[in-house]
Amino acid sequence: MDLLTLWNLEREEVLKIIEDAEYFKKNRYGHEILKNKSIALIFESPSTRTRMSFDLAVNELGGHSLMMNEGEIHLGKKESIADTARVMSRFVDAIVARVKNHKTLEDLAEYGSVPVINALCDLAHPCQILADLLTMKENGKNFKGLKLAYFGDGNNVSNSLMIAGAILGMDVVIATPRSYEPNGLFVKKALEIIAKYGEGSLTLTDDPEIAAKDADVLYTDVWISMSDKNKQMDEILKIFPKFQINDEILSKAKKDAIVLHCLPANRGLEITDEVIDGKQSKVFDQAENRLHAQKAVLKYIFEH
């Protein structure tokens, strides 16, 4: 089974992945789930948390990881993605890919014969969000009815947060500048999932105070995403500052609210030092949880 986006998962499946991640966090070593299995790790862009967490996850589950950076693999250059997928499927048992374009993942999944995991692309970041959900749960947050407020650019992280929130019955509010809203297809899918389960909600706004009011979780990401390299910083600095998570915005949330950021952070831009280093910040627990969530994802795809 592939994991390219979260919208193909049922609520029970998401909850089981989180439950397994909790187990792996408490029991880090001594597993052989991936014994005699080799996992290719394809990275088209530099990474700290994603690379470390997946590399360690594979090895700590008893498998072998094969790291392939851009420049070490053809992947559409000199060889079609389809042919690359076919060849790699003869060597490895699964492919974990952090790529620039979602279409690359779709092609790997279509033409390969082994499971493909989206470790990040321009449209979605499902593995990150599963780690986020673990972080919320271990901080006493019940998913159903939880208010999750996201601030900043409507990017891959916001897209996947909407889907996860819809699956679990959250009230998700996405606060972005106009014309920086999340991807329309992901909005549509989230609303369909909300209708399916009959609970939860999705609100898009350009007012960060509406998002912050009585929020249980405040979340932000960098203002210049991987799909926005052509944006000028002066444009960003003109329209994004009011979406910064700072003490004033945090004061409008619930007293026991937590703050998340998928990292790396541009301190002083999307989040202040005071908040990211403050008591309500769980960003480094969140980063650690990538390891445990990746293990749960690997377990899941080999069981389905």
Swiss-Prot record:
Query: What reactions does this protein catalyze?
Result: carbamoyl phosphate + L-ornithine = L-citrulline + phosphate + H(+)
Q: What's a Gene Ontology MF term here?
A: ornithine carbamoyltransferase activity
Q: Sorted alphabetically, which Gene3D superfamilies does this protein's record hold?
A: Aspartate/ornithine carbamoyltransferase
The processes (GO biological process) annotated in the record are: arginine biosynthetic process via ornithine; citrulline biosynthetic process; L-arginine biosynthetic process
In terms of superkingdom, the source organism counts as: Archaea
Specify which residues bind carbamoyl phosphate according to the UniProt entry for this protein. S47, T48, R49, T50, R98, H125, P126, C127, Q128, C262, L263, R290
InterPro entries, from UniProt?
Asp/Orn_carbamoyltranf_P-bd, Asp/Orn_carbamoylTrfase, Asp/Orn_carbamoylTrfase_sf, Asp_carbamoyltransf_Asp/Orn-bd, Orn/put_carbamltrans, OTCase_ArgI
Protein family: Belongs to the aspartate/ornithine carbamoyltransferase superfamily. OTCase family.
Please identify the protein, giving its name as recorded: Ornithine carbamoyltransferase
User: What organism does this protein naturally occur in?
Assistant: Methanococcus maripaludis (strain DSM 14266 / JCM 13030 / NBRC 101832 / S2 / LL)
